């Protein structure tokens, strides 16, 4: 198992692959067929090239028996981590405050 640096966020596709698919011996193709979505959709998620949408979260929830919110929280955490790495955020200054 890889050591994860502090503050690093794992893409939800990596969690899907290592914690759900691999233990069950599921391929991306098989999972896609079972979820009634395209194989590239699942493959791109597993490769970290695509985000988990609400629709995908609902399908994964129904299939694996966990909540859709679980998947969306993983995606949201990853998205915030990526956004926080954006150097241009430091140039944003506070605007007018409500009186």
Label each residue range with its predicted role:
Residues 38, 49, 64, 75-78:
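The DNA-recognition helices of helix-turn-helix-type DNA-binding domains
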Residues 1-4, 97-99:
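Intrinsically disordered, low-complexity and often Lys/Arg-enriched segments
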Residues 25-44:
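Short alpha-helical DNA-recognition segment
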Residues 49-62:
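Short, basic-rich loop-to-helix N-cap that marks the start of a DNA-contacting helix
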Residues 17, 42-43, 68:
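Alpha-helical structural signal
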Residues 21, 32, 61:
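The alpha-helix within a helix-turn-helix
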Residues 2-26, 73:
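A short, Lys/Arg-rich alpha-helix, primarily the initiator
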Residues 72-99:
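Short, charged recognition helix plus adjacent turn
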